[in-house]
Amino acid sequence: MTSNNLPTVLESIVEGRRGHLEEIRARIAHVDVDALPKSTRSLFDSLNQGRGGARFIMECKSASPSLGMIREHYQPGEIARVYSRYASGISVLCEPDRFGGDYDHLATVAATSHLPVLCKDFIIDPVQVHAARYFGADAILLMLSVLDDEEYAALAAEAARFDLDILTEVIDEEEVARAIKLGAKIFGVNHRNLHDLSIDLDRSRRLSKLIPADAVLVSESGVRDTETVRQLGGHSNAFLVGSQLTSQENVDLAARELVYGPNKVCGLTSPSAAQTARAAGAVYGGLIFEEASPRNVSRETLQKIIAAEPNLRYVAVSRRTSGYKDLLVDGIFAVQIHAPLQDSVEAEKALIAAVREEVGPQVQVWRAISMSSPLGAEVAAAVEGDVDKLILDAHEGGSGEVFDWATVPAAVKAKSLLAGGISPDNAAQALAVGCAGLDINSGVEYPAGAGTWAGAKDAGALLKIFATISTFHY
């Protein structure tokens, strides 16, 4: 393909990479290519062969053309250890000038993770395929906006020598047709316009209609949160996500929230329950401070829980209307006002303002709203801008009952967690309401007949509900 057909940004990157080819040849000149071992980790298989379920290729990168430097202290091995908990494959940028990549990063990740590793590069020459495999790649990226059919076929044949899978990137209908003719099995649809770096999230939907049913469709670029994943999940098998993860200080938290959403497991009473909640996929852990509640925790238990599982964001839940400062210890991320609804919207706003003044700017303030109350929807809409999150619950909370989800105002959904009787049996229906996440409590506890375990968090139920959450799409 002539350079006149290449997008300006892409053309400059590819030409720069072409200038690196001699350096790459010198770097692996000592390598007997014919003796390179074949890959034993299949990206295609790890992505479930396109048979359903949201899968992720999480990317290690320190910079990008659209954002510049995104992670100054870049440790791909540490990032890969995190990704290994959540992803089905790991992509590693190897282009140095615009992405800060290097083959050393590829080798580090390949040696760190059990997952198949994708060499993310602008591959135009067989020596790059050889280098990818030598440094541990199990798959390579080939871009049809860069390669003509003859070039692609030659590089694909070279990849086949080492059992490397190919992520074939396409950006329009013509490239999809070419990819099908060339035998592609993994289609990467890039939402980014390579001319101006803009994003079109509808591109994967349009092109999905043309991609064979037995292929894997990977949506690339612009996948920034779990809501986007759920919007695209009806036609995409997998998602390649990089900048949204490596730009965050806490990569583990960012990956967990991307895969599962901002969900909370409330009523934690033991360190082991907190550890299971986090391992299952929860972002938030609720600690209840009410002596009348069977899930009440003492300050001593609170400290043990936080020490045992520091990777949850803990929310102190209470029915009080004052004294929230007394609940603040190291590790408390938010306070949740679970007091009964006040007599008016003005009184609600005053209560929230008083609590916010009490706890200070470093602690979030959440408000639980009884949606069973005739005023619930009105109050939720009125105070949405005053709080960091709303908890939409039945009655005064803790009842294990479900309210009428149709009463949730559309305007508050993005800032709300849906609560009240949510269990593995109705989690999918709860997610379909479209709130930011779920607040899970009694629906994942052992029943009354479980002996001494009755009322404790059921680890199996937690795993089951988060499995449903991770595969849900609209």
UniProtKB/Swiss-Prot annotation:
Protein keywords: Amino-acid biosynthesis, Aromatic amino acid biosynthesis, Decarboxylase, Isomerase, Lyase, Multifunctional enzyme, Tryptophan biosynthesis
One MF annotation (Gene Ontology) recorded for this entry: phosphoribosylanthranilate isomerase activity
Pathway annotation: Amino-acid biosynthesis; L-tryptophan biosynthesis; L-tryptophan from chorismate: step 3/5; Amino-acid biosynthesis; L-tryptophan biosynthesis; L-tryptophan from chorismate: step 4/5
InterPro entries (UniProt xref): Aldolase_TIM, Indole-3-glycerol_P_synth, Indole-3-glycerol_P_synth_dom, Indole-3-GlycerolPSynthase_CS, PRAI_dom, RibuloseP-bd_barrel
Region (N-(5'-phosphoribosyl)anthranilate isomerase): 263-474
Coiled coil: none
Pfam families registered for this protein in UniProt: IGPS, PRAI
Catalytic activity: N-(5-phospho-beta-D-ribosyl)anthranilate = 1-(2-carboxyphenylamino)-1-deoxy-D-ribulose 5-phosphate; 1-(2-carboxyphenylamino)-1-deoxy-D-ribulose 5-phosphate + H(+) = (1S,2R)-1-C-(indol-3-yl)glycerol 3-phosphate + CO2 + H2O
GO biological process: L-tryptophan biosynthetic process
Listed PROSITE patterns: IGPS
Annotated EC: 4.1.1.48, 5.3.1.24
Region feature Indole-3-glycerol phosphate synthase, mapped onto this chain: 1-262
Family indicated by similarity: In the N-terminal section; belongs to the TrpC family. In the C-terminal section; belongs to the TrpF family.
Function statement: Bifunctional enzyme that catalyzes two sequential steps of tryptophan biosynthetic pathway. The first reaction is catalyzed by the isomerase, coded by the TrpF domain; the second reaction is catalyzed by the synthase, coded by the TrpC domain.
Assembly behavior: Monomer.
Protein name: Tryptophan biosynthesis protein TrpCF
